């Protein structure tokens, strides 16, 4: 069985936890790895405790593993409740809190804002797992556009790893060569539901946005022209169910979703 590595990024809402996790997932996917990931977050615009966890391997991965190889805290204190999740020899990176030091506050402010902490973290992770730097920068640039500070942030995180954690790089087991040439895509659960509805012949989707089902509505709305379906956002869930039932009674294939 192929070795599975698991990484968790933790921090407050608004710190870019999910962005860093999604970008790492894209880099791993483009590098040929198999992966499973998930995020946890409260119903807050800022603050609270958010995490993004990824398990990846050269072989197929069928779930997110509980024990962590690497834990990175984007802000003070967000690593503490996950200490017991660490594997023996696992690495915890914090900002001057007694673990492996990653001075995210200082490094990001040198670039002008705390918002770059997540991209610095991504650069460090790419270094630690000996992933392809050129490919990673291409994905970062595509995601953030022409903002050169994000590229500088990635470079600073990568260089910090080179200068301080050379001895812990997993290059013997993880490498920058493409593991699998088989083309794979990354989808979340809601997108998978949306694809399933489309492939099943859906012609109308009516829904009121309510977490966690909102993603299905957004996915189908974004693709309604390509899929040749009608997406309706009515005033409430009862109206959505009524529209779906009416379309079905008229001979259409319809669906609705809520939480």
For every predicted segment, state its role.
Residues 1-200, 204:
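Active-site cofactor/cluster-binding pocket
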Residues 6, 198-204, 224-228, 249-255:
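Short, surface-exposed connector motifs at secondary-structure boundaries
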Residues 12, 39-42, 184-189, 208-210, ...:
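Active-site nucleophile and cofactor-binding loops and adjacent substrate-binding regions
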Residues 21, 217-251:
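Glycine-rich phosphate/ribose-binding loops and adjacent secondary-structure elements
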Residues 44-45, 213-214, 221:
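Short secondary-structure capping/turn micro-motifs that flank functional sites
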Residues 46, 63-69, 227-230, 251-258:
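Short, basic, glycine/proline-bearing loop/turn elements
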Residues 74, 78, 84-86, 236-238, ...:
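Phosphate/diphosphate-binding loops
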Residues 121-126, 191-199, 214-218, 239-249:
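Contiguous, well-ordered alpha-helical segments that form the cores/surfaces of helical PPI scaffolds
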């Amino acid at each position: 069985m192929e070795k599975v590595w698991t990484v968790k990024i933790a921090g407050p809402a608004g710190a870019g936890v999910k962005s860093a996790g999604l970008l790492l997932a894209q880099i791993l996917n483009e590098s040929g790895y198999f992966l499973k990931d998930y995020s946890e977050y409260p119903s807050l615009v800022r603050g609270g405790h958010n995490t993004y966890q990824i398990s990846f391997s050269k072989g197929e991965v069928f779930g997110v593993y509980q024990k962590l190889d690497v834990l990175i805290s984007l802000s003070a204190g967000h690593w503490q409740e996950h200490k017991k999740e660490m594997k023996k020899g696992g690495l915890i990176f914090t900002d001057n809190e007694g673990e492996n030091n990653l001075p995210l506050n200082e490094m990001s402010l040198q670039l002008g804002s705390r918002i770059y902490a997540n991209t610095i973290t991504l650069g460090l992770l790419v270094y630690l797992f000996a992933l392809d730097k050129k490919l990673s920068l291409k994905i970062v640039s595509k995601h953030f556009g022409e903002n050169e500070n994000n590229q500088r942030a990635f470079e600073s995180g990568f260089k910090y790893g080179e200068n301080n954690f050379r001895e812990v790089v997993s290059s013997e087991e993880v490498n920058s060569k493409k593991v699998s040439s088989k083309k794979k895509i990354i989808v979340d659960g809601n997108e998978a539901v949306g694809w399933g509805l489309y492939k099943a012949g859906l012609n109308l989707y009516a829904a009121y946005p309510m977490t966690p089902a909102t993603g299905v509505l957004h996915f189908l709305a974004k693709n309604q022209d390509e899929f040749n379906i009608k997406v309706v956002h009515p005033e409430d869930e009862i109206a959505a169910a009524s529209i779906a039932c009416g379309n079905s009674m008229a001979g259409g294939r319809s669906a609705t979703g809520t939480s």
